[in-house]
Amino acid sequence: MATATPVQQRAGSRASAPATPFSPTRLSRLQEKEELRELNDRLAVYIDKVRSLETENSALQLQVTEREEVRGRELTGLKALYETELADARRALDDTARERAKLQIELGKFKAEHDQLLLNYAKKESDLSGAQIKLREYEAALNSKDAALATALGDKKSLEGDLEDLKDQIAQLEASLSAAKKQLADETLLKVDLENRCQSLTEDLEFRKNMYEEEINETRRKHETRLVEVDSGRQIEYEYKLAQALHEMREQHDAQVRLYKEELEQTYHAKLENARLSSEMNTSTVNSARGGMMESRMRIESLSSQLSNLQKDSRACLERIQELEDMLAKERDNSRRMLSDKEREMAEIRDQMQQQLNDYEQLLDVKLALDMEISAYRKLLEGEEERLKLSPSPSSRVTVSRASSSRSVRTTRGKRKRVDVEESEASSSVSISHSASATGNVCIEEIDVDGKFIRLKNTSEQDQPMGGWEMIRKIGDTSVSYKYTSRYVLKAGQTVTVWAANAGVTASPPTDLIWKNQNSWGTGEDVKVVLKNSQGEEVAQRSTVFKTTIPEEEEEEEEEPIGVPLEEERFHQQGTPRASNKSCAIM
């Protein structure tokens, strides 16, 4: 018996990686299921007819039995071989579909990571441009600081020259001061000497005065003794002359002493005034020099502090620039490494996808060969039915067409059943048509035909607030509505999937939402979903319509000659040979 992939497994894979309704693999398996069931039914009818012929033709029972045994063994071998190859092909197709879905999911994830890396790279580039702008600003500030530093150094050199000049002047003034002090000391010594001389002259004057007085007294005594001898007339004249001579001598002596004293005082006062003026001039010069030195020292100290501050700022700016350059180089290396890693991973994923596509093409070649084998098998059965005058059951074929698909893919799925009762099925064709429209930024991207989810997408470059928006699903006369919360916002370029409660998916806002009050969105032949904004205006709609038609019966193939061996054709597709040289003898 042929193996079948459970429907629940397909639904689970579709929930984990959403696929389009009636994927090519599912449609192909449905078609294979119908074909195999039709072949099994026809084979069962054929076997029943053979048995009835065996009972009716008792005379030919032994011959028919032998030929039926031979034919049964050949059919059993062909059937086992066919079922084995078909099961292998189905497993390979299932594995390929799963791997392809997994690779598509990984590809989407890597694309998202690549987009995020591009965003991070753009952000790093903007940070780099900002850092470069800041670096240029720091360089301009550093240049201005260097200019200010050069100016300060020039001022410092000029001030140092002025300081040296002031030091020379101070040295000269100090030398002048020492000379003035020495001169003052000499003048002081001279003053003391003059005072001593004046004192000695005064004492000498007093001494001489005393001597003169003694001499006068002596002379007076002598004159007094002579006066006795001189007559009285001459005594008065003599005394008068003597007094006048003494008075003149005293006045002359006093005038000489006074003149000498005045000259001495004038000389002393002049020298003292000169020394005082020289000392004051030296003191004022020294004070001004000291004031200039203090000002120069204070200015030098302020310039030194400014210079140290500028040097500190310059060192800090250089360190910051070096740090920013290191960070920038590190970020560039990290970005290049991450981009190279992602590009290598994407290249590996592309290689894996290409390998999977090649394997898928090979499996399609195998499937095409199996379809041709099934067709040859059908021709054999129809030839035997026509030869034995059996009523063939009409072929059952299912074709599904999608409005969004550009090719027709036939896949098989299902488990064959042995049918004991002859039954005929009408050939049918199922077509699915989708139509969608949108007048705003949000469109309805997908409706699950199983009623598990509805997906919306924001096609604009702006975030869309969804507060108060309503999504209405209509199937015939029934309708259900879902309202978004007042704070929900659909990001630019983002999709949101609203799952039913029984979809088996966990909520992951803001991309996956769960409608807990509704177990299913519902299924039917005519499904329509309308999206309305908070003002009740229709901004998007999407509808899915299922149509079933009955095509005309295929023309019967010509009857094959009895007992002639049939050889299957060799099929080639894309350079891959697939040949089968099996022959079957039909009696």
Swiss-Prot record:
Residue numbers spanned by region Disordered: 1-29, 390-432, 550-587
Subcellular location: Nucleus lamina
N-acetylalanine, modified sites: 2
Residue(s) carrying N6-acetyllysine: 111, 157, 271, 330, 483
Oligomer and partners: Homodimer. Lamin dimers then assemble into dimeric head-to-tail polymers. Ultimately, two head-to-tail polymers assemble laterally into a protofilament with a uniformly shaped rod of 3.5 nm in diameter. Interacts with SPAG4 and SEPT12.
Function: Lamins are intermediate filament proteins that assemble into a filamentous meshwork, and which constitute the major components of the nuclear lamina, a fibrous layer on the nucleoplasmic side of the inner nuclear membrane. Lamins provide a framework for the nuclear envelope, bridging the nuclear envelope and chromatin, thereby playing an important role in nuclear assembly, chromatin organization, nuclear membrane and telomere dynamics.
Region (Head): 2-34
Post-translational note: B-type lamins undergo a series of modifications, such as farnesylation and phosphorylation. Increased phosphorylation of the lamins occurs before envelope disintegration and probably plays a role in regulating lamin associations. Phosphorylation plays a key role in lamin organization, subcellular localization and nuclear envelope disintegration. Phosphorylation by CDK1 at Ser-23 and Ser-393 at the onset of mitosis drives lamin disassembly and nuclear envelope breakdown.
Region (Coil 1B): 82-215
Locus of motif Nuclear localization signal: 415-420
Stated name of the protein: Lamin-B1
Record-annotated LTD domain positions: 430-546
Record gene name: Lmnb1
